[in-house]
């Protein structure tokens, strides 16, 4: 991959030994080897994906060529029937556009009302119906709960710590 000979590899090893020292050189070699391994696997993956994409593109191109060839090699009977179908589809399309049933259906189902600007004009001649019974709910007072009494901090007596027995208090 890098086209390095034995003498060049030996020279790089000696320079690395002088620069890094005998303790850090093995760690550096492992790190560089890991980088090279990762680059190789990445290059292989990219190469495989490109190869698959090229094969897929070639397959699609050949498929298109076969489809075009099969359409040009149709029998005259099939060509005539395809032309008839195209003409029938176009005539149906033209008649559908000319007699658009959806527009006619929308127009037939549209309710035409004059715009009412005044609220009183909308309710002209309408009287409200009288209610036979009026709904009511029983009157209840909300329940009150007594609030807890809190003693002020001034009434509280400070507690003093009891002296602890020590060895000097003994007789």
From Swiss-Prot:
GO terms for molecular function: identical protein binding; protein homodimerization activity; proton motive force dependent protein transmembrane transporter activity. The chain crosses the membrane at residues 1-21. One of its GO terms (biological process) is protein transport by the Tat complex. It is found in: Cell inner membrane. GO terms for cellular component: plasma membrane; TAT protein transport complex. Disruption phenotype: Disruption blocks the export of seven endogenous Tat substrates. InterPro entries: TatB. Induction: Constitutively expressed. The membrane-extrinsic domain forms parallel contacts with at least one other TatB protein. The Tat system comprises two distinct complexes: a TatABC complex, containing multiple copies of TatA, TatB and TatC subunits, and a separate TatA complex, containing only TatA subunits. Substrates initially bind to the TatABC complex, which probably triggers association of the separate TatA complex to form the active translocon. A complex containing only TatA and TatB has also been identified. It could be either an assembly intermediate or a disassembly intermediate generated during translocation activity. Part of the twin-arginine translocation (Tat) system that transports large folded proteins containing a characteristic twin-arginine motif in their signal peptide across membranes. Together with TatC, TatB is part of a receptor directly interacting with Tat signal peptides. TatB may form an oligomeric binding site that transiently accommodates folded Tat precursor proteins before their translocation. Belongs to the TatB family. This is Sec-independent protein translocase protein TatB. It comes from Escherichia coli (strain K12).
